A protein has these predicted regions:
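Helix-loop "lid/cap" segments that line or gate small-molecule binding pockets
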Residues: 78, 94-101, 109-118, 193-198
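Hydrophobic alpha-helical connector segments
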Residues: 62, 66, 76-106, 157-163, ...
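Helix-turn-helix
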Residues: 16, 24-58, 62
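Generic hydrophobic, amphipathic alpha-helix propensity
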Residues: 10-22, 38, 63-67, 71, ...
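Residues in soluble alpha-helical coiled-coils and helical-bundle/repeat scaffolds
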Residues: 4, 54-58, 62, 80-84, ...
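Amphipathic alpha-helical packing segments from all-alpha helical-bundle domains
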Residues: 69-72, 76-77, 102-105, 121-147, ...
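Hydrophobic/aromatic-rich alpha-helical bundle segments in the mid-to-C-terminal region
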Residues: 124-128, 132, 146-194, 201
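N-terminal intrinsically disordered/low-complexity leader segments
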Residues: 1-12, 202
């Protein structure tokens, strides 16, 4: 097998195991799954799992990194076709809220990862980078809107934090208790609230 084929197989196996890990962690939670569970889900041997990942923590870190990368890729695709700041801001909201409809298991996995923040610096840093990227994206959209005379914001950093808090806080509350409010209605209300924060004369 040549080097290219080896790399392709390596990437294929890692993707296979990461996908299996995502499913297993969503079902069992961080503390209750084993490497054997992931191997069985992937249809591979436990020895092969250990070949590609040092340990359980290493596998989970790679899983979190891939989850975050996929999120950012989807967001970038949604934003790159838009030109108006208002449309970009609404698209950001739509992508964030749609993730719960599309991948509810993601948030169960994410909450488990949050519980590991004080025990694993790599997981902490991965989450820090993810939320920083969200704030940076919102800040860039706001600055573009201000430059075009569409948005009026006094403190860009504070406004970015508020917007991310509104979106993520709404999603988190619904994940914990899906009877607390009508998710579809709340999404619309939150988007209106966000627009009222940034748009001139709204």
């Amino acid at each position: 097998m040549n080097e290219r084929n080896k790399n392709n197989l390596l990437n294929l196996r890692r993707a296979q195991l990461t996908k299996a890990a995502y499913k297993v962690v969503a079902q069992k939670g961080y503390n209750d799954f084993t490497i054997k569970d992931i191997a069985e889900e992937a249809g591979l041997s436990t020895g092969l799992v250990h070949y590609y990942f040092k340990n359980k923590e290493d596998l989970l870190f790679k899983l979190l990194k891939e989850m975050n990368a996929n999120l950012k890729e989807q967001l970038n695709k949604a934003l790159m076709v838009l030109t108006e700041p208002k449309d970009k801001l609404l698209a950001f909201c739509d992508e964030a809220f749609a993730l719960l409809d599309r991948e509810k298991a993601y948030f169960y996995v994410l909450i488990d990862f949050w519980a590991r923040i004080n025990h694993d610096t790599r997981i902490r840093q991965a989450n820090v980078k993810l939320f920083q990227s969200y704030r940076d994206e919102i800040a860039a959209i706001i600055k573009e809107g201000m430059a075009k005379g569409v948005f009026m914001v006094v403190d860009v950093k504070l406004t970015s934090v508020i917007i991310i808090s509104l979106i993520q806080g709404t999603i988190l509350q619904y994940v914990i208790d899906n009877e607390v409010f009508n998710y579809r209605e709340m999404k619309m209300n939150i988007k209106e609230q966000i627009l009222s924060i940034v748009i001139k004369g709204k």
